[in-house]
Structure formats: C-alpha cells, structure tokens
C-alpha cells in the first residue's frame, strides 16, 4: 500500500435546503457573492473534481486541478490540469502540488498543518471523499429547487464550527473530528 502524502481534504459545496447541488449539468440558482467567496477560498490550492463537473465549468485560475475520471486515455491539458483514474492517484497528485508550495494557498509554511486540497464536486466525488474530509464549507442556499444531483447528508460526526449569513445563503463550516485516514482510499 502506498503512503499518500500529507494533505487535508476539505469539501466545498453549494446546496439548497434539499441538498440539491445540480440540475441538467448546472446549478439552479445564481448568487455572485457565493461564487466570489468560493473562488477566493480555493484560489492557490490544489482541487479535485470529477470529469463531468470539470467539463461543465470554466478553468479555475490559480488552482492545480486534478480531474478524477475512469477514462485512462486522458492526458494533461496544461501544466495545471492532471487526470487521475483512482481516488488515491488524485489525492497523491493534489498533495504533491500542495507540498511543492506553488499551490499551497495561505497554509504554505504558515504553521505545521498540512496543505489543504479542496474537493469541489460533483455528486459521486463528494460521496467518495466525504468520509476522508476534515472539513466542509457548505453554502446553504435558502431555496427549494428541483434537482438531479445531491450532496450527501452530514451525519452526527460533523460539528458546525461557524456560520456566515449572506443574502439568500449562509456559508457554514463543519468539522469531522475523526476523518478516515487517506491511506484507506
């Protein structure tokens, strides 16, 4: 078994009151303030996302992007995009980018905590990585929408750390006291 380099997985998601995160390849709401805080949060950090989510978005500047895909014929689109066919390879690639300092965000050298890797969707990727994440930043959209993609319920092991109210949504930070070790991926 390979040892995965040290990194903290943090999920970032926007979900409505029913945990809807998507509809027909997009999101059924538009909050520019939420998009700004999201981009500011992940800027300079490595990110992991699924192929369909990657294809539905514009490239995110200042982020090392690891795309989780089952297509082993994919190759890097640029110096900042890498494809991975397993969760282990995805985390290893993101951790390498974070450890290099080039994509370590504000946590680089700030203290002894490991570099942060953000997991930004979609549904299957959230389901896969949630047990291994130490934190979740959830933009809770105060709407009830139709959807075809959902964020999983956070169980009793998750504790709310903070809540920032905004017009139409709250940004809530949750912490999981004992995430599963990344080597169990």
UniProtKB/Swiss-Prot annotation:
<dbReference type="InterPro" id="IPR012259">
    <property type="entry name" value="DHFR"/>
</dbReference>
<comment type="pathway">
    <text>Cofactor biosynthesis; tetrahydrofolate biosynthesis; 5,6,7,8-tetrahydrofolate from 7,8-dihydrofolate: step 1/1.</text>
</comment>
<protein>
    <recommendedName>
        <fullName>Dihydrofolate reductase 1</fullName>
        <ecNumber>1.5.1.3</ecNumber>
    </recommendedName>
</protein>
<dbReference type="Pfam" id="PF00186">
    <property type="entry name" value="DHFR_1"/>
</dbReference>
<dbReference type="GO" id="GO:0004146">
    <property type="term" value="F:dihydrofolate reductase activity"/>
</dbReference>
<dbReference type="GO" id="GO:0005829">
    <property type="term" value="C:cytosol"/>
</dbReference>
<dbReference type="InterPro" id="IPR024072">
    <property type="entry name" value="DHFR-like_dom_sf"/>
</dbReference>
<dbReference type="GO" id="GO:0046452">
    <property type="term" value="P:dihydrofolate metabolic process"/>
</dbReference>
<comment type="function">
    <text>Key enzyme in folate metabolism. Catalyzes an essential reaction for de novo glycine and purine synthesis, and for DNA precursor synthesis.</text>
</comment>
<keyword id="KW-0521">NADP</keyword>
<dbReference type="InterPro" id="IPR017925">
    <property type="entry name" value="DHFR_CS"/>
</dbReference>
<dbReference type="InterPro" id="IPR001796">
    <property type="entry name" value="DHFR_dom"/>
</dbReference>
<dbReference type="GO" id="GO:0046655">
    <property type="term" value="P:folic acid metabolic process"/>
</dbReference>
<keyword id="KW-0560">Oxidoreductase</keyword>
<dbReference type="GO" id="GO:0050661">
    <property type="term" value="F:NADP binding"/>
</dbReference>
<dbReference type="GO" id="GO:0046654">
    <property type="term" value="P:tetrahydrofolate biosynthetic process"/>
</dbReference>
<dbReference type="GO" id="GO:0006730">
    <property type="term" value="P:one-carbon metabolic process"/>
</dbReference>
<comment type="similarity">
    <text>Belongs to the dihydrofolate reductase family.</text>
</comment>
<keyword id="KW-0554">One-carbon metabolism</keyword>
<feature type="domain" description="DHFR">
    <location>
        <begin position="8"/>
        <end position="185"/>
    </location>
</feature>
């Amino acid at each position: 078994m390979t040892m995965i380099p040290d990194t903290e997985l943090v999920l970032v998601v926007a979900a409505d009151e029913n945990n809807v995160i998507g509809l027909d390849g997009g999101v059924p709401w538009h909050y520019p303030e939420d998009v700004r805080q999201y981009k500011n949060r992940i800027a300079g950090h490595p990110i992991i996302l699924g192929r369909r989510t990657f294809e539905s978005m514009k490239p995110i500047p200042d982020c090392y992007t690891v795309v989780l895909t089952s297509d082993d014929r994919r190759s890097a689109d640029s110096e900042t995009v890498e494809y991975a066919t397993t969760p282990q390879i995805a985390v290893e690639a993101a951790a390498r980018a974070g450890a290099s300092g080039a994509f370590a965000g504000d946590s680089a050298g700030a203290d002894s905590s490991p570099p942060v890797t953000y997991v930004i969707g979609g549904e299957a990727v959230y389901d896969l990585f949630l047990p291994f994440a130490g934190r979740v930043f959830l933009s809770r959209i105060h709407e009830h929408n139709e959807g075809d993609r959902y964020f999983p319920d956070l169980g009793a092991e998750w504790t709310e750390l903070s809540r920032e109210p905004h017009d139409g949504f709250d940004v809530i930070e949750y912490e999981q006291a004992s995430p599963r070790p990344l080597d169990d991926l």
